């Protein structure tokens, strides 16, 4: 956990590492964390919005609409078939008391806090030897953004425009900085210098 008023920057996971982690967590019967990481990586939702999801919102559906906690804006999301299947599998193993229950409930019966999720993610990072420096809830949203950008590398400006809208950023420059692209571009400048 970071100190209050200190700045830490979450890093993204390489997509293949994120997908492997989702599978490993499910194999190890850690279905709640597998589902959390899958939802974060496939939807790009903020952790506050993931924690507010109920089973009835995401189970047996292709699309669902939320009101974002941070912005108050309504947002419709689509779940691809693989994610839908993973949700159903996790639901079957977790066996919530009712489908109106929140999806990420602790053993005490309360919704996980963001702080607790971050502690768990740090434990997961260590246990599964993830190659990421700062791994937190926000890493999932950044992983989503990086994958969307990487999949559209031949038309990166269009990808950035889409991500800017999805993330509700006010400019492409903010989205680039958010994804760490601006820093990479700056550092690449040094590579072009020759002696």
Residue ranges and their predicted role:
Residues 19, 82-132:
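Active-site/catalytic core of tyrosine-dependent DNA strand-transfer enzymes
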Residues 1-19, 73-81:
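DNA breakage-rejoining catalytic core of tyrosine-based enzymes
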Residues 131-151:
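Short basic/aromatic active-site micro-motif
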Residues 68-72, 167-192:
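Catalytic-site neighborhood detector that most strongly recognizes the C-terminal catalytic loop/helix
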Residues 36, 44, 48-53, 163:
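Alpha-helix N-cap/helix-start motif at helix boundaries, enriched for small hydrophobics
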Residues 52-83:
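Conserved tyrosine-mediated DNA breakage-rejoining catalytic core shared by Y-recombinases
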Residues 2, 13-43, 154-155:
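Basic, Lys/Arg- and aromatic-enriched nucleic-acid-binding interface segment
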Residues 49-50, 145, 153-169:
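Active-site-proximal segment of tyrosine recombinases
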């Amino acid at each position: 956990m970071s100190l209050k008023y200190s700045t830490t920057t979450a890093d993204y996971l390489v997509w293949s590492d994120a997908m492997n982690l989702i599978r490993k967590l499910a194999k190890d019967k850690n279905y709640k964390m597998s589902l959390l990481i899958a939802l974060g990586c496939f939807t790009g939702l903020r952790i506050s919005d993931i924690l507010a999801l109920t089973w009835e919102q995401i189970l047996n559906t292709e699309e669902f609409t939320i009101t974002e906690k941070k912005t108050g804006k309504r947002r419709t999301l689509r779940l691809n078939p693989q994610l839908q299947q993973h949700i159903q599998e996790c639901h079957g193993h977790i066996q919530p008391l009712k489908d109106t229950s929140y999806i990420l409930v602790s053993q005490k019966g309360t919704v996980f806090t963001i702080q607790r999720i971050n502690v768990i993610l740090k434990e997961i990072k260590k246990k599964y030897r993830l190659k990421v420096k700062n791994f937190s809830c926000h890493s999932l949203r950044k992983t989503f953004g990086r994958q969307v950008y990487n999949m559209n590398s031949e038309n990166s400006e269009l990808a950035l425009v889409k991500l800017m809208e999805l993330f509700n950023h006010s400019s492409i420059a903010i989205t680039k900085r958010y994804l760490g692209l601006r820093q990479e571009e700056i550092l690449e400048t040094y590579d072009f210098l020759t002696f």
